[in-house]
Amino acid sequence: MDQQRLTHLKQLEAESIHIIREVAAEFDNPVMMYSIGKDSSVMLHLARKAFYPGKIPFPLLHVDTDWKFREMIEFRDRTAEKYGFELLVHKNPEGLAMGCSPFTHGSSKHTDIMKTQGLKQALNKYGFDAAFGGARRDEEKSRAKERVYSFRDKNHTWDPKNQRPELWKTYNGQVNKGESIRVFPLSNWTELDIWQYIYLENIEIVPLYLAAKRPVVERDGMLIMVDDDRMKLKEGEVIEEKSVRFRTLGCYPLTGAIESEANTLTGIIEEMLVATSSERQGRAIDHDQSGSMELKKRQGYF
C-alpha cells in the first residue's frame, strides 16, 4: 500500500487494522477490552472493518465496576445486540460482596478492587493471552512510553524498564505460558484524530459525550453528574442543571464533566482544535497521587 496516497486518518486506520489482524493471527486466545467509551467505539469499528464481511473472531470483554453511567450500560447492550459480537461482562464478586464503592472505599481502592483485580480475574478465568485496549499515547505520560505490544508477566504486571523494541511495524508477541500481551492499536492516535474519525465514519457513541442539560454537583474542582440515588451529597453541595458533556467516561462519581454547548460532532471537533488540557483531567483516579496511572499499570491496570 502506497502510504503517500493515504490521508492521515487512513494511515492511522491502516496501521490499527494491521495490528488487530496481526494479533488475531499470532495469538491463541485474544480478547478486546470494551469500556464503552469513544476509543472503544473506534476500536470496535476497526475490528469490524478488519474482518469484514466475517464476524470479529474474538470476544469483547467489559469489566463492569457497577458504577458506570446508566447510559453507558444501555449503549453497551444495544451495541452488542446490533452487531452480534460475543460480549463477556465480569464484575468482581469479592468487591460486590464487600459493597465496594467510590464513596465507601475511595477512588484508589475502588479502582484497584473493581477494575484492576476484576480485570485480572477475568483474564485468568478465560485464559486470554492477548488483550486489546484503547489507550493512546497522547492521553497520559505513562501511556506515552508504553509499546504497542505491552508485555505482562504471570501476575499481569507491567515493568516499563523491560519493554521490547518495536522496529518499524515488527511486533514481538512471544510469551510463555501464563504470560500475556496488552495490545494498543490506537497508540498513535490523538483525541482529535478519534473525533474526526468518528465524524467521518459515522460511528455511534454514548450520548454523554454530547452537551446537554444534566444534573451536576461541584466536588473537588470537578462537575460530577448525579446519575442515580446512590450519589450522596456532602454538606453545602447543591444539584444544578448545567449544559455539560464528558471528554472521558468512567465510574460516574469519579468522572468530571465540562461545561459545553457542543451538542454535535462538529461542535466537539471545534472544541478540540483549541483545547489545551488533557481529557484525563476529568478522571479522579489520575489524581490519587503523583504517577498514579503508572503505579496502577504496574499493578495490572490497563
From Swiss-Prot:
It comes from Vibrio vulnificus (strain YJ016). With CysN forms the ATP sulfurylase (ATPS) that catalyzes the adenylation of sulfate producing adenosine 5'-phosphosulfate (APS) and diphosphate, the first enzymatic step in sulfur assimilation pathway. APS synthesis involves the formation of a high-energy phosphoric-sulfuric acid anhydride bond driven by GTP hydrolysis by CysN coupled to ATP hydrolysis by CysD. This is Sulfate adenylyltransferase subunit 2. The keyword Nucleotide-binding applies. Its EC number is 2.7.7.4. InterPro entries: PAPS_reduct_dom, Rossmann-like_a/b/a_fold, SO4_adenylTrfase_ssu, Sulfate_adenylyltrnsfr_sub2. The gene is cysD. SUPFAM superfamilies: Adenine nucleotide alpha hydrolases-like. Keywords: ATP-binding, Nucleotide-binding, Nucleotidyltransferase, Transferase. It catalyses: sulfate + ATP + H(+) = adenosine 5'-phosphosulfate + diphosphate. The keyword Plastid does not apply. It is an enzyme of class 2 (transferase). GO terms for molecular function: ATP binding; sulfate adenylyltransferase (ATP) activity. Belongs to the PAPS reductase family. CysD subfamily. It comes from the Bacteria. Heterodimer composed of CysD, the smaller subunit, and CysN. GO terms for biological process: hydrogen sulfide biosynthetic process; sulfate assimilation. Pathway: Sulfur metabolism; hydrogen sulfide biosynthesis; sulfite from sulfate: step 1/3. Residues 280-302 are annotated as: Disordered.
